[in-house]
Amino acid sequence: MSININSEVALTYLIAKKKQTLVASLGVTFGISMYIFMNSLISGTNEYFEKMTLSATPHIRLYRDHQISNSDRLNHFLGKASTNLISNPKMVNSDERIDDPYTLLQALKTNPASLAVSPQITATIICSNGSLQENGNVSGVNILEQDKMFDITSTMIAGTVKDLSTDPNGIIIGSGMAENLSLKTGDNITLTTSKGSTKVLHVSGIFRTTIKNVDQTKCYANLSVVQQLLKKDRSYITDIYVNLKDYTKANRIGKQFELVTGYRVETWQSANEQSIAARMIRDMIANSVVITILIVAGFGIYNILNMMIYEKIKEIAILKATGFAGRHVVAIFIFQALFIGLLGSFTGILLGWLLSKTGSMIYIGKGNLEYLPVSFYAKHYIQGALFGIITSFFAGYVPALRASHVDPVEIIRG
């Protein structure tokens, strides 16, 4: 039996039931377009929040962790001859500095996985301008390395990061702090620590991240300035930030750094577990909604083909009586289902792209988010089309099997 005859019969049935064919195709179209739009929107939103996270969090942070007193030293000196216990163990008072930091910095910079490495010290301070005061924190950094990691330049609204790198007594402050203290570039600002140390700096630049808490409290100064403010020597460094060429490998590489250096490692994933959990929930919700829509579309195809078989039962019997085998009848109805799936997939891809494009033009205008974050990835369109075709195939397979088992003698007699 020629495949062309099967196709011709299938097309004849589809054309005879134009409205049902159109309704079934629209169901697939709607399902695929929503699949594409929802995935484009969710992936765009995830990328936006991930970008925001990585703009403020290093891929890997190395630091000395606080330790609880234990019996390790007693066990070392007394051996196994005695059992040593510590009653009411407490946190050990220890310096937070990293030992020989510049050697470690050089080793991390030469690591092939590293993109940028920056030392850091953070101090809690009171910033003042005359009688005006604001609580904040100042990060002592190599500002050029820090800019390479977090793109501070893109947030600057006055001055530049280079101005700070060439000014030993400069400071970059957030726009919220500048507004609250009535400061502009070139003005002086006084920093005071909890131990009473003070230092007068002048404002080299002002940044705006649109995150209110950051803009009102965050400051950047040169490493040596914060060391002087804390009355520490030039080797005093408490944190080392590392950005990787591939940030998705932070957990694996972080474990390697922890084993080699002996310092505690915090990756961007462990520092932002709630954000990652929220991303997973968003993905689950979006996929659940879209899969439900496609399943409903599949049931639509199933019902329409079932009705078509019921209405064409005599024609099917005549086909079988004239030499069509059961597999040919299956092929006819599978062809119809796939035709509906392909038609719906094609129009669904076009509608999905149109919805995504329209969505990307919706103006938000909040913070640094101007438009609705929508991504455009070919994989979403391919996945949507495949899912639509597969759903259509299975939706048509069951009715096709039913049609193939029709007994022509019984139907014609009836």
Residue ranges and their predicted role:
Residues 66, 177, 185, 190-286, ...:
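Mechanotransmission and gating elements of multispan inner-membrane complexes involved in transport
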Residues 11, 377-414:
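C-terminal membrane-exit region of the final transmembrane helix in multipass inner-membrane proteins
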Residues 306-308, 314-360, 383, 387, ...:
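Transmembrane alpha-helical interface segments in multi-pass membrane proteins
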Residues 356-382:
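Short juxtamembrane loops and helix-capping segments at transmembrane helix boundaries
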